[in-house]
Amino acid sequence: MTIRKAISYSFLSAIIILSSCIGNSTPKPKGFLRIEPPEVQYVLFNENELPYTFSVSQYATIELPPADSATYWINIDYPEFDAKIYCSYINITAGTLDEHVEECFKLAERAARNVAVITKKSYENKDNNVYGTLFLLEGESPSPVQFMLTDSAMHFFRGALYYKYKTNADSIAPVTEYIKNDIVELIQTFYWKK
C-alpha cells in the first residue's frame, strides 16, 4: 500500500503543479522612453580660425577640424541624445552658388524618400548678410532637420542633423524639436567674420 500511496501522492502533486501554471496572464502595457530635454541656454561659439560665429546650446559640444586642416567644417554633438549636426563650410563664388544650393535641395530630397512632408523655411538677416533655408523632414528620415546659409558671394555653410542609431520619429520627436530650436537659434545668430 505504501507504493500505491506514494504513486497517488506523486500523481496528485504533479496535477497540482501543472494546474497551478495555468491561469489568465495579464499583458503588460508597452513602456515608452520619456525624453525630457533640459532647459536651454545659449553661449556664443567664436573660434578664431573659423570665418563664422553663432550661438549654440550649452549642452552641445563642438568638434573642430584638426589644427593643421584648411577646412572649416565642425560637428555639433549632443552626447546626451546620441545626435550630431554635421556642418560643412565651402568658399564659393557667385558662379558656384547655384550649384551648392541645388546640391542642398537634392540632399534634403534624398533624405526625404519615405517622408510625407518637407517644410522649407527661408531666413534672411540683411544686417549680417546671412540668407538661408531650413528643411524640416516630417516622418521617418535619417536626417529630420537640415539647413544651409550663405552670403551669396563668398561663404556657404550647410548642416544636417543625424542620430547615432536608427530611431522612430514619434519616439524621438521631443529631441528633434529641441535640436531644431537650437538650429533656428544658430541660424538667427549666425554671422560671417571675414
Where does each model-flagged region fall?
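Short secondary-structure junctions
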Residues: 53-67, 110-125
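Secretory pathway targeting signatures of secreted, lumenal, and periplasmic proteins
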Residues: 50-103
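C-terminal motif of bacterial Sec signal peptides marking the signal peptidase cleavage site
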Residues: 17-20
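Solvent-exposed, polar/charged alpha-helical surfaces in well-ordered, non-transmembrane soluble domains
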Residues: 54, 58, 102, 106, ...
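Bacterial signal peptide processing site
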Residues: 22-25
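Short, well-structured beta-strand
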Residues: 120-194
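Post-signal peptide N-terminal segment of mature Sec-exported envelope proteins
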Residues: 29-50
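Bacterial N-terminal signal peptides that target proteins for export
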Residues: 1-11
